[in-house]
């Protein structure tokens, strides 16, 4: 028996089915459109990007340039600034093969804040791990950091910012390392699925 329990006082109303579907349709969408209620200074500071839909790009070169910046995102019908990589949310999928050596040039285009990328679960030298204050100083505004490392393992991982609440604001992506030897089985198609949540609030304010 299914019983519907009415929300208590002060409860946040659930979005309508229509709004939920609109949010799903916008998955991975970064929109450069103005919205009522968004401060004009925020709109001016954010990068005006075209509407992007579908899965993020897959980057598999061993030399890759990544630009961390601010774009406008709309998942719920409201627009707010997000932290993106190459204008994409989620960030591009990075896909390599075990045994390769990769060079990533990560440029910080944020005007006021440092940033970083941590390669979650990857075996790395300390100065390539990407944790500010622990393994390096972070990437200041206008700076570029050169990550250089050998891939000594295979598996499915992810990468994300370790600076402030940038991960919660959109700076995360999938990292796939295929084994050195081809898989002993066939498959028709492969899908990379990332689960995350989203808030229209400033993540820093949400965690206070």
Predicted regions and their residues:
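N-terminal export leaders
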Residues: 16-35
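N-terminal secretory signal peptides
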Residues: 1-16, 26
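Acidic-aromatic/histidine active-site loop/patch
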Residues: 192-208
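Histidine- and aromatic-enriched segments that form or immediately flank copper-ligand environments
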Residues: 59-186
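C-terminal segment of N-terminal export signals and the immediately downstream linker at the start
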Residues: 34-72
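RNA pseudouridine synthases
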Residues: 188-190
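Short, glycine/acidic-enriched capping/hinge loops at junctions between secondary-structure elements
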Residues: 3-4, 8, 76-80, 206
């Amino acid at each position: 028996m299914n019983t519907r329990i009415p929300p208590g006082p002060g409860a946040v109303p659930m979005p309508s089915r229509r709004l939920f579907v609109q949010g799903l349709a916008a998955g991975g969408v970064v929109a450069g459109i103005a919205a009522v209620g968004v401060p004009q200074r925020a709109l001016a500071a954010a990068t005006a990007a075209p509407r992007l839909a579908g899965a993020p790009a897959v980057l598999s070169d061993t030399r890759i340039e990544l630009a961390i910046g601010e774009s406008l995102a709309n998942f719920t019908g409201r627009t707010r600034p997000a932290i993106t990589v190459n204008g994409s949310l989620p960030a591009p999928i990075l896909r390599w093969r075990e045994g390769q050596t990769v060079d990533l040039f990560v440029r910080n285009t944020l005007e006021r804040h440092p940033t970083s990328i941590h390669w979650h679960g990857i075996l790395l030298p300390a100065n390539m791990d990407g944790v500010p204050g622990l393994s390096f100083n972070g990437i200041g505004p206008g700076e570029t950091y050169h990550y250089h490392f050998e891939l000594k393992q295979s598996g499915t991982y992810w990468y994300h910012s370790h600076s402030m609440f940038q991960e919660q604001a959109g700076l995360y992506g999938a990292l796939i390392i295929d084994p050195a030897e081809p898989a002993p089985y066939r498959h028709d198609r492969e899908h990379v699925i990332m689960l995350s949540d989203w808030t229209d609030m400033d993540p820093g304010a949400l965690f206070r």
